[in-house]
């Protein structure tokens, strides 16, 4: 899955090197009390940083998972107050991004001016956090954050979809039991690879001897139909579902005639073309006649900003990766991978660091201070943002030429077990990793009962919530997922 690289850096907390697990296990929970205003509601809440020992699939102690929880001090009824468990992807990265990006009581505020120096980023009160409607628990899988495997357990034992999810499943069931919350409505939020984890965890919770049936799952930057993101030459669906993202980027960078259409309107027009005329032309392959090929190539230019001549020479295809270097090639600029709104000069070799990686600078800078000043965490341990795991090292669940990766089927299983279970899918228009077209395609092909899934698109990239208006839209959607009303909106 080369099109979905991870963020490769580690954030050090304290001056010492990474501690042994024994030192981590010695820490007692750190509890602090706070007051915040979220969605206009004043909330007194308790922040708790604590570790929970979890077993492996055989029941043997395997890891200590450290979480950050925020719980309302004065709920109307603690047993019925919703709780949402939050994690990122990686495959193994800490929950830092969702924690400080959108869901926690503080958030990194990134200016609308994309050229702004990261030194101008600020850590602000997060008025968008859904703490007004749910308690939040941020999970760092073993080998990330302060979480570690126990002696006798190798980190590699968790390098699979199933084992990784089993660890999180064990943590959630234990947390709910220890905190007396087994009757609380429970939800998951996963981002990027975390959406695959969320699907598997939801199913594993339902398969426990004493099942835990979640009320819902939110998938941000969904990747459950991961095969549609890998643009092999013969995977024609992947090119069709990627066109809406190319159209969004061409519209944003003013490389197409907008025809007075908004971003949403332009993308929808490109999507209609992609799933009809474009997909049909791709299916014809080398049997397509010259006149139709030329007509489709011209339409592709109108939507993507890439000259028709390029499409004629490349079988009516351009990969997302190639597109990043082609759209603004005349200006010597490369588009961001995580967020294609960001640009940076290409090197002599035509390569450059992902221009949108500048977003992460603020997170690294603020998290250390937040831990110490707000949460009173002053442990000497290293807070590991990401465990560097090659995608080829990860066991995705299928092997051999006839394997399948039906992650969406795991959510279908939960829907059948719980008629009230629902799914929110959110994606950023300018995200070239997990694209809006593929998300819409996933919902259409999932076989989920009608009205159980809601699909929302936001301005921005892989972390669309770094855009102020998208932050509000996304958290409003999360509140809708948790609330009583559910206006399902399936893919058009």
Task: List the predicted regions and their residue ranges.
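N-terminal cap/lid subdomain of alpha/beta-hydrolase-fold enzymes
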Residues: 19, 59-157, 444
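A catalytic-pocket lid/entrance helix-loop region that shapes and gates access to the active site
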Residues: 107-109, 206-291, 295-299
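Alpha/beta-hydrolase active-site loop
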Residues: 131, 141, 158-176
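Alpha/beta-hydrolase fold nucleophile elbow
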Residues: 181-193
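Alpha/beta-hydrolase fold catalytic core
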Residues: 281-433
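Short alpha-helix in the alpha/beta-hydrolase fold that links the catalytic acid
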Residues: 421, 435-445
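Catalytic histidine neighborhood in serine/cysteine hydrolases
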Residues: 447-463
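Catalytic histidine-centered segment of alpha/beta-hydrolase-like enzymes
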Residues: 461-471
